[in-house]
Amino acid sequence: MELKLCVCGVLLVSLTISGSLAQMDVCGVAPLNTKIVGGQSADAGTWPWQVSLHRDGSHFCGGSLISSRWVLTAAHCFPSSSLRGLLAYMGRDNQDFLNPNEVSRSVTRIINHPDYEDTPNNNDISLLELSSDVTFTDYIKPVCLAASGSVFPANTNCWVTGWGDIQSGVPPSFPQTLREVEVPIVSNSDCSESYNTLTDNMICAGLTEGGKDSCQGDSGGPLVCKNGTVWVESGVVSFGRGCAQANFPGVYARVSRYQTWISQQIGSDLPGFVTFVSDGSSGSDGSGNSAPGSVHLVYFTVPLLFSLLPVLFSVLVLS
């Protein structure tokens, strides 16, 4: 019995670690992203985890590929659980021309956070299960997710992407190419002066003077921050007052608050979770290398271990 328990324990940990490590090998890596400073339209492949969600042929929300079969997005994008006409496009560059690097999948399951509240958009996060796995390419890769304990100090520079309006009520022009904007993190204490319904499940980003922000149609898309050599999703586009208004930064669901919930829903093929820790400074670490923060890889989670306990039980008790 002791030997059997030991062997099963080693097997359990080995399988769990190997599965998570496989995801960590690819998440947050964007080979075609050579960006240093901001632009407007993003080159194809710059943000390979960006997902375009379509209902009956029209884009309505963004999302992020977080593993070969799962997309992270916003709960407010899905007031209904209907799967009719719902498609997810990965590797898409624009909404009007052909996209030779894209693939599409239907969505087989929508999992809104059980504690989502449409007022004040608390826990505005959702998971979508795709109909089949997608193959990773330079144009299609998963993003790393901020792990529990991640810290995003004020003025940490991050990027938000999407096909939303370029300003309130003004849709993007033909051919509706994926757009990007660089925005600094705003502390929750400062952000709460603009939004009195702000909670710890939210993170804010934007310029005090306005002019740069996510907008309608960007909902569910990623706010990502570079951590060493990988990109980490810190937030999911949630809400704001208008678009890019002065003193009203964009508000995002804080991804690091949901590591346990995400892991419990997915069970296997877990995303790569990275603990983002930054001093809020930009530039170099003195060696000529960019040093926005440090990376601590999270290889496996307690929920996944518990999900495998029935297997161990059957092996130990029934054999």
Per-region residue spans from a language model:
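Extracellular trypsin-like serine protease catalytic domains
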Residues: 30-37, 50-56, 147, 156-291
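Gly/Ser-enriched beta-turn/beta-hairpin loop segments
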Residues: 41, 97-102, 119-122, 137, ...
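Protease-domain processing segments flanking chymotrypsin-fold serine proteases, especially trypsin-like
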Residues: 2-72, 87, 92, 273-319
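Solvent-exposed loop/turn segments at secondary-structure junctions
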Residues: 57-59, 77-78, 94-95, 117-118, ...
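Conserved H-D interstitial segment of serine endopeptidase catalytic domains
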Residues: 29-35, 53-54, 71-74, 79-118, ...
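Active-site substrate-binding loop(s) of clan PA
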Residues: 99, 111-117, 133-173
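Conserved active-site neighborhood of the chymotrypsin/trypsin-like protease fold
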Residues: 71-75, 122-147
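Extracytoplasmic
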Residues: 46-48, 81-85, 102, 123-125, ...
